[in-house]
Amino acid sequence: MPRLKLLHGFHAITARLRAFPATVNEVWYDPARQDARMRAFLHLAASANARLIAADASRLNALSGEKRHQGVVARVTEATRAHSLETLLDTIEGQPLLLALDGVTDPHNLGACLRVADGAGAHAVIAPRRRAAGLTAAAAKAANGAAETVPYLTVINLARALRALKNAGIQVIGTADDATTSLFDIQLDGALALVMGAEGAGMRRLTREACDEVVRIPLAGHVQSLNVSVASGICLFEAVRQRLKRL
């Protein structure tokens, strides 16, 4: 039986309407909002044959679990996604670019990581099934639409999954504050999986041991570490820069 979930906010729902319109079943909206953005949104939802339901602010708050829903909430069917590494890799054309997250439990950080992954053209974000943030409505809203465009694959054992990626010819590069090699001194223009640990805790030991190499982002100021989404963006776009330079 298909799983249902709720999304809220214009970006998350609009991205789903554009990417998987048939999965949007119902849309609750605030009729008090009659601006151009709401009109365009409702037109898009109606074009997808979603059922439109007028709802007041208290109803929208109850549905979304928060007040920052922008006046729109949608009930959607889970989109079909890759359920295994093998399936994921079979869908990728060209050199894979993957982001793996180890121990990232904050849904807002997950959403931000999905957003930078989308911006860099990454093919997927991978995380362990346990001790990791789920793809909740809060994560989807923070992703600003990227949760509907970037596959989020959860695996039982992240270290084992990384070894499988290596066996498939994908270079696995981890990041850590105590690494001696700089991110900017390593070749990243091939098939690549970048592994990010949680801020503070970093990668777990087995995850780190599964990496081909571990690098650091050189910091010139006084802070000791970066937010995981910021660090992910730096690493992903360095890989993109090297790929473009090679062309």
UniProtKB/Swiss-Prot annotation:
Disulfide bonds: none
Swiss-Prot/TrEMBL catalytic activity: guanosine(2251) in 23S rRNA + S-adenosyl-L-methionine = 2'-O-methylguanosine(2251) in 23S rRNA + S-adenosyl-L-homocysteine + H(+)
Subcellular location: Cytoplasm
Main location (coarse class): cytoplasm
Keywords of this entry: Cytoplasm, Methyltransferase, rRNA processing, S-adenosyl-L-methionine, Transferase
EC number: 2.1.1.185
Enzyme class: transferase
The keyword Membrane appears for this protein: no
Record: residues binding S-adenosyl-L-methionine: G197, I217, L226
GO cellular component, one term: cytosol
GO MF terms, alphabetically ordered: RNA binding; rRNA (guanosine-2'-O-)-methyltransferase activity
SUPFAM superfamilies: alpha/beta knot, L30e-like
CDD domains: SpoU-like_RlmB
Family the entry assigns: Belongs to the class IV-like SAM-binding methyltransferase superfamily. RNA methyltransferase TrmH family. RlmB subfamily.
Described function: Specifically methylates the ribose of guanosine 2251 in 23S rRNA.
HAMAP family attached to this UniProt entry: 23SrRNA_methyltr_B (MF_01887)
Official protein name in the record: 23S rRNA (guanosine-2'-O-)-methyltransferase RlmB
Origin species: Burkholderia sp
Gene: rlmB
